[in-house]
């Protein structure tokens, strides 16, 4: 029996040549380089020359083999050359990421409200410098202007229109639609005063729209194409007609309009169009100007590698073009008045529940119509955002129905939503889309099942984490990869404000769970906790980055005054926030979110 003579005879001396195992390659060195290793072992006196040869050989790139080729290799057979180069790639859907929640109205802006001009561009550049790849905004619809709505982006008059108060006057000057000397003096207000801003900006935006309509250049051609866009036409005309009627009739809602207009008689609508043709055209041109500026921001964000996450309220306001033009899709009586309205029972945001008063959908009628209204709405959202959150996602599994005559949300009952039939129709029409499910509040098993069936991430909020026991789903050790974790949402207090009113027992839990809370600002302790979470996506609010108290809170649910008004302090510029950007980027790198 033949034996081998190697430098380690005590290991190999008795091994037959035929049964001798193949030399195992060094980690990262292809099998074809084994001759180099053998040369070093057999001829120690030539180790230096062999090492040089090995170094040269290692530098030769070997492409990883095709997966199919590897799969075809039988058990025990030799794998293709380059097999050890088949390193698993990180799928984009598995890449960890982080972003900032900041509604555009909260940017500084020169005219009392944030806009889509230089400050929005500066914010995107700051996000890039901070290593963030997400900008989350609230709904971009025109905010509610009636009593009690107080600028709410969740009470808009149309689900598809853009908020024209966000239009930058300075960008209109660049487009040649306004003159420099027509711009008003800067309006530096600590908080947004929506009526004041509207009185200042709306006449100038209307003037710019009128000049656009009178022009014959490239911009006018773009406007004509905008109106023909299938994602725009239809809802745009309904919204313009609705606005024209609304301005001409002093009524609380369309329910009080004269019967021919209330019920959309063709002759009545034609009469309104002829009488208010100029207003209607200007209205539509303003929507084009919003779209033009927003797409400019989206294009710049994409250039920087930043995705924009939108927000879609599940319900729409009763006094809206959506309900007026699509009555059969809502639970209304024969006169057009809601039979039931939306709300939620008591939850973490409100001890008495919340009465939203939006009309509920007639899901049976919608399903019979192929969910056409919703498909159009989703297509519009995809025109504005890279991904979006569906607010009150649980309403698609089961919704809280409150009789319209009730004054409190406690008087209600649960009713079944459209469930998978809705998403089956949606995905068939538009394909798979990036949806985030807002699954806060009363979350039952069917809501979880629905969310997982469409592979939509849910949410966790750290401000909810420290009450209750160790099984609290908002505690970081209970997070899941398929989640978006927040320090707080627009409905929460700032972290500083939350901390100032947190019961002492819960504070002690925070100190035990987050030891760094003893050594740093509490807002940054929660930011760190959010970024270190196993959740794929982490979102922090700009208020928490700035370490602001309750005076910077965006919204207090179940209240009607003082909400949606916060703006970044006038003393702060994005240039001055370089230290915060560096601090955030360091944390993102530490937790693999760059």
Curated annotation (Swiss-Prot):
Principal localisation: plastid
Keywords: Amyloplast, Carbohydrate metabolism, Chloroplast, Glycosyltransferase, Plastid, Transferase, Transit peptide
Localization terms from the record: Plastid, Chloroplast; Plastid, Amyloplast
GO MF annotation terms: 4-alpha-glucanotransferase activity
Disulphide bonds in the chain: none
Gene Ontology biological process terms in this record: glucose metabolic process; maltose catabolic process; starch catabolic process
GO cellular component, one term: amyloplast
Reaction(s) catalysed (UniProt annotation): Transfers a segment of a (1->4)-alpha-D-glucan to a new position in an acceptor, which may be glucose or a (1->4)-alpha-D-glucan
Transit peptide feature range: 1-37
EC number: 2.4.1.25
Superkingdom: Eukaryota
InterPro entries tied to this protein: Glyco_hydro_77 (IPR003385), Glycoside_hydrolase_SF (IPR017853)
Function of the molecule: Chloroplastic alpha-glucanotransferase involved in maltotriose metabolism.
Family: Belongs to the disproportionating enzyme family.
Protein name as catalogued: 4-alpha-glucanotransferase DPE1, chloroplastic/amyloplastic
Originating organism: Oryza sativa subsp. japonica
Phylogenetic placement of the source organism: Eukaryota, Viridiplantae, Streptophyta, Embryophyta, Tracheophyta
């Amino acid at each position: 029996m033949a034996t081998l003579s190697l430098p380690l005879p005590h290991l190999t001396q008795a091994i037959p040549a035929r049964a001798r195992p193949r030399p195992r390659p060094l980690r990262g060195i292809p099998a074809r380089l084994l001759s180099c290793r053998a040369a070093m072992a057999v001829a120690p006196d030539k180790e230096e020359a062999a090492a040089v040869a090995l170094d040269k050989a290692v530098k030769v790139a070997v492409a990883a083999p095709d997966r199919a080729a590897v799969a075809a290799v039988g058990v025990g057979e030799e794998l293709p050359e380059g097999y050890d180069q088949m390193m698993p790639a990180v799928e984009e859907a598995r890449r960890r990421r982080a972003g900032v929640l900041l509604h555009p109205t909260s940017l500084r802006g020169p005219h009392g409200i944030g806009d889509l001009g230089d400050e929005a561009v500066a914010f995107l550049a700051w996000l890039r410098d901070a290593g963030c790849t997400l900008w989350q905004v609230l709904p971009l619809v025109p905010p509610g202007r009636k009593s009690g709505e107080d600028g709410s982006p969740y009470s808009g008059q149309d689900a598809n229109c853009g908020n024209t108060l966000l239009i930058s006057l300075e960008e209109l000057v660049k487009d040649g639609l306004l003159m420099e000397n027509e711009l008003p003096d800067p309006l530096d207000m600590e908080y947004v005063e929506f009526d004041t801003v509207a009185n200042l900006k709306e006449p100038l935006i209307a003037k710019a729209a009128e000049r656009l309509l009178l022009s014959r250049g490239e911009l006018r051609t773009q406007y004509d194409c905008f109106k023909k866009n299938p994602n725009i036409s239809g809802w745009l005309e309904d919204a313009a007609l609705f606005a024209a009627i609304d301005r001409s009739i002093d009524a609380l809602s369309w329910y009080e309009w004269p019967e021919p207009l209330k019920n959309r008689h063709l002759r009545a609508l034609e009469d309104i169009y002829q009488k208010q043709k100029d207003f209607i055209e200007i209205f539509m041109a303003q929507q084009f100007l919003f779209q033009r500026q927003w797409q400019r921001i989206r294009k710049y964000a994409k250039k920087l590698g930043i995705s924009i996450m939108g927000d879609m309220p599940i319900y729409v306001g009763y006094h809206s073009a959506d309900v007026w033009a699509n009555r059969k899709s809502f639970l209304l009586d024969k006169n057009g008045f809601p039979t039931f309205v939306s709300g939620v029972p008591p939850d973490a945001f409100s001890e008495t529940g919340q009465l939203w008063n939006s009309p509920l959908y007639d899901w049976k009628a919608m399903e019979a119509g192929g969910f056409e209204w919703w498909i159009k709405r989703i297509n519009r959202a995809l025109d504005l955002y890279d991904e979006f959150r569906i607010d009150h996602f649980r309403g698609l599994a089961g919704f809280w129905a409150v009789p319209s005559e009730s004054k409190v949300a406690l008087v209600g009952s649960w009713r079944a939503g459209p469930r998978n039939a809705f998403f089956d129709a949606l995905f068939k029409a538009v394909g798979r889309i990036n949806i985030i499910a807002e699954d806060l509040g009363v979350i039952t098993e069917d809501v979880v099942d629905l969310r997982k069936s469409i592979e939509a991430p849910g949410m966790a909020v750290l401000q909810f984490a420290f009450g209750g026991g160790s099984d609290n789903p908002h505690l970081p050790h209970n997070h899941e990869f398929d989640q978006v974790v927040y320090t707080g949402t627009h409905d929460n207090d700032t972290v500083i404000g939350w901390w100032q009113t947190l019961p002492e027992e819960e504070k002690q839990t925070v100190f035990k769970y987050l030891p760094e809370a003893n050594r740093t600002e509490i807002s940054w302790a929660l930011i760190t906790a959010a970024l270190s979470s196993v959740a794929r996506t982490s979102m922090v609010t700009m208020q928490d980055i700035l370490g602001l108290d309750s005076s910077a809170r965006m919204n207090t649910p179940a209240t009607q005054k003082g909400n949606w008004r916060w703006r970044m302090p006038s003393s702060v510029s994005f240039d001055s926030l370089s230290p915060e950007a560096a601090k955030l980027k360091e944390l993102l790198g530490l937790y693999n979110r760059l």
